[in-house]
Amino acid sequence: MKFIDEAKIEVAAGKGGNGATSFRREKFVPRGGPDGGDGGKGGSVWAEADENTNTLVEYRFVKRYQAKNGEKGHGSDRYGAGADDIVLKMPVGTLIRDLDTDEIVADLTYHGQRVCLAKGGKGGLGNIHFKSSVNRAPKQSTPGEEGETRSLQLELKVLADVGLLGMPNAGKSTLITAVSAARPKIANYPFTTLHPNLGVVRIDENHSFVMADIPGLIEGAAEGAGLGHRFLKHLSRTGLLLHVVDLAPFDETVNPAEEALAIINELRKYDEELYGKPRWLVLNKLDMLDEEEARARTAAFLEAVGWDYPEPDDRFQFDMETPRLFQISALTHQGTQELVHQINQYLAEKKRIEAEKAEAEKAAANVEIIEQQPKTDTGVFKPE
């Protein structure tokens, strides 16, 4: 299936059915009272996040979604039937924006989440509602309300904990294959990856995280060169970036340090917030080098890029702010287990810190509410 991560659609809810003007027709009752029923509600249009849907391709072909109108009311106090709602299944991670107001209508972040995109109109009132002591035979009824209509921009940003960043052919697809069940296309030429791939990295029965591989970046990506610029947005929801570098390129004229600096430059030009995300360095393809050459190339690379990556004896004692360096071979799996265990540890600690911060903010808000409550002269809270 073709990977489509953007689409524009129009959604239109149904109109409510008109209320009925009707009177009872009974033998020997010359002036039967009003019995016109209400109209049915118009159908609404909903978006629902579906973990089994991976692309917005369907919305490239069908641009307009129209719910049906409600049925009109009937005599004998019979109400019109309401129209069925339309439910549009969208991938988890879809951002929905109103094209007219630029308002974010919904951010679908979990499976089963439902959001109303266009509300159906209410049914009109039948004349039974207008009977009064001075008007025993009202002829008025009301029309159904119009349903909402919206023009929407759909944008898919994949939900992943970790994002892979690097030049084409750096070995990102091989890495995601080595540590997860994902099976992206792999070949020894640039731009093998043409769309984002997601892999679930399972540490044990209770611990796992999602890794995203996007097409490789090249210089000028922020201005639209290559493929990666279209997919950089998919890294915006990640909590950690892995910058994968080919330490042993087949082309000896390629300078890994220059390529790495170009990647970071493109990242910064594209989005300052994305540039500021925690970023670990992963030097790949160690299987192509002997131990001495790998050490020499690593030292030369770090000196050329000017990045400071400490290497303590116990790597598991890193604090959250320290950048980390890993030397791996995705092909032979050398160093990959240490990498995924540290990622898991980092994400667990990050989650704990965020939970503590949220709890502290909640407690502070509760204190503020209490302090704002009026008190008596004795300091006792005064009831509202």
Curated annotation (Swiss-Prot):
Disruption phenotype: Essential, it cannot be deleted. One of its GO terms (molecular function) is ribosome binding. Residues 160-348 form the OBG-type G domain. It is an enzyme of class 3 (hydrolase). Mg(2+) binds at residues 173, 193. Keywords: Cytoplasm, GTP-binding, Hydrolase, Magnesium, Metal-binding, Nucleotide-binding. Residues 130-143 have a biased composition (Polar residues). Gene3D superfamilies: GTP1/OBG domain (2.70.210.12), P-loop containing nucleotide triphosphate hydrolases (3.40.50.300). Optimal binding to GTP occurs between 5-10 mM Mg(2+), binding to GDP is inhibited at > 1 mM Mg(2+). Residues 20-46, 129-149 are annotated as: Disordered. It comes from the Bacteria. One of its GO terms (biological process) is ribosome biogenesis. Induction: Expressed constitutively, reaches maximum expression in early log phase and remains constant until stationary phase. Similar levels are seen when cells are grown under iron-limiting conditions, anoxically or in the presence of human serum, which mimic clinical infections (at protein level). Monomer. HAMAP family: GTPase_Obg. Belongs to the TRAFAC class OBG-HflX-like GTPase superfamily. OBG GTPase family. NCBIfam families: Obg_CgtA, PRK12297.1, PRK12299.1. PANTHER family: DEVELOPMENTALLY REGULATED GTP-BINDING PROTEIN-RELATED, MITOCHONDRIAL RIBOSOME-ASSOCIATED GTPASE 2. This is GTPase Obg. It comes from Neisseria gonorrhoeae (strain ATCC 700825 / FA 1090). The gene is obg.
